Amino acid sequence: MSIRILLVEDDDHICNTVRAFLAEARYEVDACTDGNEAHTKFYENTYQLVILDIMLPGMNGHELLREFRAQNDTPILMMTALSDDENQIRAFDAEADDYVTKPFKMRILLKRVEALLRRSGALAKEFRVGRLTLLPEDFRVLCDGTELPLTRKEFEILLLLVQNKGRTLTHEIILSRIWGYDFDGDGSTVHTHIKNLRAKLPENIIKTIRGVGYRLEESL
């Protein structure tokens, strides 16, 4: 499964350079140069990491950090020219996970990205939830050691829910993350796949949030 990163940087040259470097490392990168656009993208998609500048048009990095952190625990790396103690302390007080000042070495940035992803579990070789073991590299799910006959889409939906355990994912987020931006289907597509997925699981671990979406409980 690909790792998806939201990159928010208003300097076009830096933004393009970082995006290209991360893409070369096989990360999927959504890049934007405006704070308001970043806000929209964050709620329309699911990301395993956010790289966030502070000085941005629209909402600034500190505002976005507070907003994003109030929603979930997605790792957030601040990437900014502001090297003073006050801005760093402010960011860490708002629960930023790391803080990198410009200029920086691209290889060091990549190592910091890898460290945050490893710490969050996004680079895990397997995920365990209840009686299930998910193996992302092989798109396989085992229940008490026995493989379940999930389709590729069913596996991707289950993994997405596991990676966001405790967070409600809307129909729109699931559609865009699993089927992509250009998919013409609607919420019924998600509903059908969830129904089929539930029928193959040993117990109903997927909770429906009526009118919103689906969630895996944090306690699993």
Swiss-Prot record:
A single Gene Ontology CC term: cytosol
Listed SMART domains: REC, Trans_reg_C
Ranges where the Response regulatory domain occurs: 4-117
Compartments where located: Cytoplasm
Biological process (GO), any one: regulation of DNA-templated transcription
One of the Pfam families matching this protein, by short name: Response_reg
Primary role: Member of the two-component regulatory system VanSB/VanRB. Activates the transcription of vanSB, vanYB and vanW in response to vancomycin which results in vancomycin resistance.
PANTHER family registered for this protein in UniProt: REGULATOR OF RPOS, STAGE 0 SPORULATION PROTEIN A HOMOLOG
Name this polypeptide is given: Regulatory protein VanRB
Taxonomic placement: Bacteria, Bacillati, Bacillota, Bacilli, Lactobacillales
